């Protein structure tokens, strides 16, 4: 997912001939680090866009730094705080400066219920597909997803598979637009990325085929469970939401002591939340928690009782 965002950002810069990349500070910190590494290697500047009280991109701050030197604006929805962005006004603002919008997501299952960033005007959609049937595995291998509008089909990295019908009426598949790739263009290729994630892709395809339209139900379950746990915890003394924006399956809370809370949960066999002060010093005392379809209601009640 992080690599997909970096590839899209650099592609936008190369296509536009501009040298600045604007990154929402609400993007996953590791994604931002990877984008900055790619940008440094290619001679581009990265500027961070602050978040507002909602946890979403601060629109006024973006207006203040967005101009015609910006190649792309990168955002994430749901973002690192679990907050859902309103992508359409961001796309309109970005396109007003003839810049490109790279819209990411933290959890692919959110696509089952949220409006497509493409329909909202994003030029690139990037993210992590691990949530589609691929187990957690100490950091990988995972499944990066990168999609674009038709205007960039001949420039995006990776392999493209085309479908057609042969003269006997049977559907056939073939690798297409290969003149973009390393084995033909060598050092002039769009990208030198060449890892093969076919196994992860196959697992995702089987998972999605099995779920079918129930992906929407799964996504709705994530929303319900996250908000149930959020409401249980914010009823406790000293616990309150850090942001006012709507959330998917993650949420950020202020709490009396994140370390003590995690220690108590760990002793009871639960994996605690993420201490936000590690990457966001201004959110010292903040904790990022998650509740997915895998978490039972009795577990959420137990967590709330443990933290009383």
Task: List where the protein language model places each region.
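Pocket-edge structural micro-motifs
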Residues: 25, 177-179, 274, 291
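Glycine- and acidic
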Residues: 17-22, 47, 71-76, 186, ...
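Active-site C-terminal subdomain of aminotransferase-like
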Residues: 132-237, 241-244
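C-terminal alpha-helix
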Residues: 306-307
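Electropositive phosphate-/nucleotide-binding environments in soluble metabolic enzymes
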Residues: 2, 29, 56, 84, ...
């Amino acid at each position: 997912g992080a690599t997909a965002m970096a590839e899209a950002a650099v592609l936008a810069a190369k296509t536009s001939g501009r040298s600045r990349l604007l990154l929402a500070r609400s993007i996953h910190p590791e994604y931002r680090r990877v984008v900055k590494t790619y940008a440094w290697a290619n001679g581009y500047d990265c500027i961070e866009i602050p978040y507002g009280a909602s946890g979403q991109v601060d629109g006024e701050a973006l207006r203040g730094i967005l101009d015609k030197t910006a190649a792309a604006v990168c955002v994430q929805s749901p973002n690192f705080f679990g907050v859902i962005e309103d992508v359409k006004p961001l796309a309109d603002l970005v396109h007003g400066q003839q810049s490109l919008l790279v819209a990411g997501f933290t959890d692919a299952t959110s696509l089952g219920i949220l409006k497509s960033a493409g329909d909202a005007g994003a030029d690139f959609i990037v993210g992590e597909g691990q949530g589609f049937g691929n187990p957690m595995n100490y950091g990988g291998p995972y499944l990066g997803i990168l999609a674009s509008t038709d205007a960039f089909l001949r420039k995006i990295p990776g392999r493209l598979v085309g479908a057609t019908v042969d003269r006997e009426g049977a559907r056939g598949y073939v690798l297409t637009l290969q003149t973009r790739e390393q084995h033909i263009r060598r050092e002039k290729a769009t990208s030198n990325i060449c890892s093969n994630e076919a196994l992860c892709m196959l697992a995702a395809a089987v998972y999605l085929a099995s779920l079918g339209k129930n992906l929407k139900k799964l996504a709705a379950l994530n929303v319900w469970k996250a908000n149930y746990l959020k409401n249980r915890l914010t009823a406790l003394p000293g616990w309150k939401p850090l942001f006012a924006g709507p959330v998917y399956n993650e949420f950020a809370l202020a709490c009396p002591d994140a370390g003590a809370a995690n220690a108590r949960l760990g002793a009871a066999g639960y994996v605690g939340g993420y201490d936000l002060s590690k990457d966001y010093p201004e959110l010292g005392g903040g904790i990022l928690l998650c509740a997915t379809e895998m978490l039972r209601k009795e577990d959420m009640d137990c967590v709330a009782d443990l933290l009383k």
